[in-house]
Structures are given as structure tokens and as C-alpha cells.
Design a protein with these regions (language model features):
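Short acidic-glycine-tyrosine-enriched beta hairpin
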Residues: 72-86
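A generic "binding-loop/recognition-motif" signal
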Residues: 42, 53, 72, 88-89, ...
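Conserved short histidine dyad/triad with adjacent acidic residue
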Residues: 36-51
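Ligand-binding loop in jelly-roll beta-barrel domains
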Residues: 86-112
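Histidine-centered metal-chelating micro-motifs
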Residues: 45-47, 66, 82, 86-92
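Glycine- and acidic-residue-biased ligand/ion/polar-headgroup-sensing regions
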Residues: 53-55, 59-65
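A short, N-terminal "cap"/entry segment at the start of jelly-roll beta-barrel domains
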Residues: 1-34, 47
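Conserved GNAT-family N-acetyltransferase fold
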Residues: 38, 58, 82
């Protein structure tokens, strides 16, 4: 199955997960997975949250920023991949002067 993010409408999700400004996202969602192309403008963030029933893989395609993962800061930039396993928490912050763009996959996990 091909997902053409060039044809998916971008939606601004204000204060996503309690973050600052908006997450601009192109999303494909089904019963088991969320796949999105995301863009955070300078100063925007995704608020801190815990992945209770899923995990998240984020591959950064442009820009720079930081992830706070289980309380520890990690610098991110194009070409890096961040993984947040089920049961862990993170936040994503664009603290640069350019857009931070990425693709994220959030697969649901069966009940333990």
C-alpha cells in the first residue's frame, strides 16, 4: 500500500498533547496504526505524553530540535530516528529557527 503524503491534506492540531503552537500533520489512520508526516514551526512542540497502548517511531527529515525522553534530553536533526517504546514518555520541541519535519509511525499493541 502506497501512502502519498503529497496528496494528503495538512491539518493544524493546536496545542497537540498540551504542546505549544500547532502540530501540522498529514495523517493516515486505521484500526492498528497511525502514520503521519509532521511539521513543527519554530517554537512549536508536542506536549509530554506516555505511550500506554502503543509505541512511536519518528524519522526526522529536516530541521533541528529536541526530544525529552523519559526525562532526558536528546538532540534531533535530519537523518536521525527517535523511538519511544510502549510504557515510556516523551515530548518533541522545535527550539530552532527553521521548521522541524518528520514522519512518525504509531502502532497499537495488543493488551498485555
Amino acid at each position: 500500500m502506497i501512502l502519498d503524503f503529497n496528496k494528503i491534506e495538512e491539518k493544524a492540531l493546536a496545542n497537540f498533547k498540551g504542546g505549544e503552537k500547532a502540530l501540522n500533520a498529514k495523517m493516515n489512520v486505521d484500526e492498528n496504526n497511525k502514520i503521519l508526516g509532521g511539521r513543527l514551526e519554530p517554537g512549536a512542540s508536542i506536549g509530554e505524553h506516555t505511550h500506554e497502548t502503543n509505541s512511536e517511531i519518528i524519522f526526522f527529515t529536516s530541521g533541528k530540535g529536541k526530544v525529552i525522553y523519559d526525562g532526558k534530553e536528546e538532540r534531533v536533526e535530519a537523518g536521525l530516528c527517535h523511538y519511544c517504546p510502549q510504557g515510556h514518555n516523551h515530548t518533541l520541541i522545535n527550539d530552532s529557527d527553521d521548521d522541524l519535519t518528520f514522519y512518525a509511525v504509531i502502532p497499537e499493541h495488543p493488551a498485555r
